Amino acid sequence: YTAISGTQGICPAGWHVPTRAEFEVLTDFLGGESSCGGKMKTSGTIEAGTGLWHTPNTGATNESGFTGIPAGMRDAGTTFMHMGYNADFFTSDEYSAGMAWGRNLYYGGITVRDEYFDKRYGWSVRCLKNE
């Protein structure tokens, strides 16, 4: 997380790591957190040889063009987990001194979860073009 501290984070000039509110604008536009996850995930499954997600990859259409891929995460140590199952993205907003807000896409559902995790974890980030 320290690599993305602040809205500029690791993004190139003219871009920034989205805030929690900016992610909410996207999820609201796509129909709300309870149903927009499938619109943000790539389609296909590992088992069928057509994608990167494990079965069932519920509701995945990627109609938004977000192209969420299930990179999983790294824990506070050196363990990588949830690859093929989750796409986890940090926002630039802190929950507390040791925690940060993020968004999560899940292979078995169509929701987008608004969660907070230990800043020592390794989640993916997205860069959003400045207005």
List the model feature ranges, each with a label.
Residues Y1-E131:
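Conserved positions within compact, well-structured domain cores
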